[in-house]
């Protein structure tokens, strides 16, 4: 019922959240337990495939919101103690748990993790015919601090040795594999620090994402409508926020997402 309306209004792409199975509905699908399973809350795998096929028939691409930045802590239905080894996929010690998300952090330096996550990308592309991915929480992957409590004001803040080289390697490999499986696939990075080169081509020294999200725009928009009367809106400031991007990176600009509508950021 929704797809015809989307097509009629001229949209050619949709993003679907909470696809991967997750035990807690309130996590919005971001505490993933079964990375290769379509969430049973919303229907069967065949029904998801039918939805994607129907969208394609209407000329609508379908992007999956994929979560490779962390995993749920649950051990019964998750990877937290898979095969009796709590560290098979995750960092040991103090780096094991994410300090803000109550979840586990993948150790991207392990071959098992790289193979697991790369095959996960390939699986959703081939089995369900998704047209690409929006990678969630990329900032958390890039930095040992997860980007928490840090200000990124100049290029020195991006290249000071606090970056997780293994995670950067994984993201680059993921983009390479995804575009080998489907050269027309779209990859989008949700990233708040402004890491240079994220959406630049791999051959140019970038990470290979097709787009990065302009996350400054919704923050600016929410602040404006909440704190300023209409007469105080400055067109020059609005123009600068919308056009503030690097020339070598394509950017997806937007005014609102689930972060604003549901989470309340």
Where does each model-flagged region fall?
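Conserved alpha/beta catalytic core and glycan-binding cleft of carbohydrate-active enzymes
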Residues: 129-131, 146-265
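Substrate-binding/active-site clefts of carbohydrate-active enzymes
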Residues: 1-163
């Amino acid at each position: 019922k929704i797809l015809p309306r989307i097509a009629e209004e001229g949209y050619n792409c949709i993003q679907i959240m909470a696809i991967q199975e997750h035990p807690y509905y309130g996590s919005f699908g971001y505490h993933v337990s079964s990375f290769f399973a379509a969430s049973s809350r919303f229907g069967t795998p065949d029904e998801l495939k039918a939805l994607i096929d129907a969208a394609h028939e209407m000329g609508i691409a379908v992007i999956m919101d994929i979560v490779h930045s962390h995993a749920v802590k649950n051990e019964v239905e998750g990877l937290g103690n898979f095969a009796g080894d709590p560290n098979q996929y995750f960092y040991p010690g103090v780096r094991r748990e994410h300090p803000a998300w109550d979840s586990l952090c993948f150790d991207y330096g392990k071959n098992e993790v790289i193979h697991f996550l790369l095959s996960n990308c390939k699986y959703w592309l081939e089995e369900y015919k998704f047209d690409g991915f929006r990678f969630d929480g990329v900032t958390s992957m890039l930095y040992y601090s997860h980007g928490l409590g840090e200000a990124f004001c100049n290029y020195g803040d991006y290249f000071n040795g606090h970056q997780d080289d293994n995670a950067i390697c994984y993201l680059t490999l993921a983009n390479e594999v995804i575009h080998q499986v489907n050269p027309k696939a779209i990859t989008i990075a949700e990233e708040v620090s402004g890491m240079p080169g994220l959406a630049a081509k791999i051959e140019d020294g970038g990470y290979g994402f097709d787009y990065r999200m302009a996350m400054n725009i919704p923050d600016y928009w929410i602040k404006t409508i909440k704190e300023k009367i209409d007469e105080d809106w400055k067109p020059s400031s609005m123009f600068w926020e919308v056009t503030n991007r690097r020339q070598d990176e394509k950017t997806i600009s937007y005014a609102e997402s689930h972060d604003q509508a549901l989470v309340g950021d």
